[in-house]
Amino acid sequence: MSGISKLSDFWVEKYKKESKKSWDKFYKRNETRFFKDRHWLDREFDCYFGLPDKLPLTILEVGCGVGNLVYPLLEVQPNLKIYCCDFSPRAIDFVKKHSCYNENRVFPFVNDITEDSLLEVLGSACIDTLTAIFVLSAIPREKQLRSIKNLASVIKPGGHLVFRDYCDGDFAQEKFMTSGDPSMIDEQTFVRQDGTLSLFFREEDIAEWMKSAGFGLVTLDRVNRTVDNRKRNLNMKRTFLQGVWKKL
Ligand SMILES: C[S@@+](CC[C@H](N)C(=O)[O-])C[C@H]1O[C@@H](n2cnc3c(N)ncnc32)[C@H](O)[C@@H]1O
């Protein structure tokens, strides 16, 4: 833990309060260039997306960004109806401007999952599969349970939540801890230079929050990946947490 520097309460509150603004600025700066399309999800979790038979299912992708998961998924499974939301209005505009946007298949909307009721927007628990990919890590721990309950409220009984996110012990967490820059909120949560939050999940925490929100565990695993950072000419060994829960 050498070099670790904790933020003052003032800055912790400020970063938490300005999270939405920080992400919207992120999309103003990076537009659609930052995240790569995610082509692995349908391969690793095909049965949750109605594959291989291309069954007509209803999906909700929360924290969808500019659609890096939505459009690759729709390409391999055109029978999906995909609701997708993000709290950055700019990100949602990019989803709508995408060349593959199809208003009969893709339904983007602005929503802060920590406080805006998804049930009010969707009207009923109509979701077969909800995807939360690198979004819950942007939310402070005290808001996790409330947010996950919000997600649970729109999933059909027997439907699934598919999760992948940062894991405790990951290379990026070690970097925060040794950088010397003041970035720590608590041992699991850090602030990036652009003001966005990054929570590194412990298995026991996410398992407890999901259980309390009415989910039964299907799988929860650590996955190791080597990620290329071409700009910095780096190969990073990353550890993510990946899981599936069933709405009881
Ligand atoms: C790391 S990006 C992941 C984007 C996308 N899921 C993907 O896998 O490429 C995190 C996204 O979550 C969104 N986000 C963060 N907190 C949120 C919240 N409270 N409600 C809705 N979206 C949120 C951010 O705006 C950002 O687009």
Curated annotation (Swiss-Prot):
Sorted UniProt keywords: Cytoplasm, Methyltransferase, Nucleus, Transferase, tRNA processing
A molecular function (GO) term: tRNA (cytidine-3-)-methyltransferase activity
Biological process terms in GO annotation: tRNA C3-cytosine methylation
Residues the entry annotates as binding S-adenosyl-L-methionine: W23, Y27, G63, D86, D112, I133
GO cellular component: cytosol; nucleus
Keyword Nucleus: yes
InterPro entries: Methyltransf_12 (IPR013217), METTL2/6/8-like (IPR026113), SAM-dependent_MTases_sf (IPR029063)
Name listed for the protein in its UniProt record: tRNA N(3)-methylcytidine methyltransferase trm141
Provenance organism: Schizosaccharomyces pombe (strain 972 / ATCC 24843) (Fission yeast)
Origin organism lineage: Eukaryota, Fungi, Dikarya, Ascomycota, Taphrinomycotina
Gene name, Swiss-Prot/TrEMBL: trm141
